[in-house]
Amino acid sequence: MSRTYKASGINLKTQVLGESDKIVTILTPEFGLIRAVAPGARKHNSSLGGRSGMFVVNELLIAKGRSLDKITQAQTLKTYPGLAKDLGKLAASQYLAEIVLSQALSEQPQEELYELFNEHLHRLEALSNANASGVLAHLAHGVFHLLALAGVTPQVQICCLSGRSLKPDFTEPNWQIGFSVPTGGTICLEAWKRLRTEGKGEINNQYPIPHIPLPMPHAQTVVVHRQEIPLISSRLGAMELALLQHLSQPEIMQIDGARDHNWLSVEQILRQYAQYQLGRPIRSATLIDSYFAANHDATI
């Protein structure tokens, strides 16, 4: 059996190893996630220095190792230099990479995930610089598509309680819909309030306050099965719901009237949902928070 193999892949994460090496986590379409040592990558003028950078796509020759494989040759196929020139684009790219790292499998083909991630990096890079709203929109689009590929798309077309289709009502300024992360999507607030009212009434009927608090050794245990009242994680208006409902499309739909704060709400809803599904926080999201806080301050 050959001790070397070829793979093409994009660098998702790097770690320092020793005085001059790096450990690179690479997403490949052929073998999924690979962790390999880039020997001497931190040395001045190393041939692997630039090739081991973030979001560089390489054709690799890799030697198998006992615990870690080793990159012996690398030829760069593609880079995304525009991402590093804009903090918002870079933060959004790292955010998406973190989700990919949580989803990707090792020793299994990951072609769809590889192609999808590269496509969304390309779209982010193509944005004009200092386009805060565009970065948020493309980030939300990418997160939604990654969740869809993993089979955990949030439900945004119907109410998770009643099953009725939901349509944003732009004629009512105070119109709102609920979003429940544990339940998996959107909830009509009228249905939710009705369930709460019915639940309280049912509890009062099933468990009346006893008139005489005497012990009842032979009393039977009554088990009551009722629909759980879901936790409302967020409330969103008509614009936020409209934006969420369009994220499943291949391209971002331009909706008149959408503002930065609408996209921020959508991103934060998807962030909560993705973190719940992944079972871990998205650390790069703090960079997005810092970037847009700074942009907001600069525009006041």
UniProtKB/Swiss-Prot annotation:
Q: Which InterPro entries match?
A: ARFGAP/RecO (IPR037278), DNA_rep/recomb_RecO_N (IPR022572), NA-bd_OB-fold (IPR012340), RecO (IPR003717), RecO_C (IPR042242)
UniProt superkingdom: Bacteria
The residue range of the signal peptide is: none
Spell out the Gene3D superfamilies in the cross-references: Nucleic acid-binding proteins, Recombination protein O, C-terminal domain
- The answer on whether this UniProt entry bears the keyword Methyltransferase reads no
Keyword DNA repair listed? The answer is yes
Instruction: Return any one Pfam family short name.
Output: RecO_N
Alphabetized UniProt keyword annotations: DNA damage, DNA recombination, DNA repair
Kindly state a single biological-process term from the GO annotations of this entry.
Answer: DNA recombination
Q: Name one GO cellular component term.
A: bacterial nucleoid
Q: Which PANTHER family match?
A: DNA REPAIR PROTEIN RECO
What does the record give as the function of this protein? Involved in DNA repair and RecF pathway recombination.
Q: Which HAMAP family match?
A: RecO (MF_00201)
Family designation: Belongs to the RecO family.
- UniProt name for this protein: DNA repair protein RecO
Organism the protein comes from: Nostoc punctiforme (strain ATCC 29133 / PCC 73102)
Query: Could you tell me the gene encoding this protein?
Result: recO
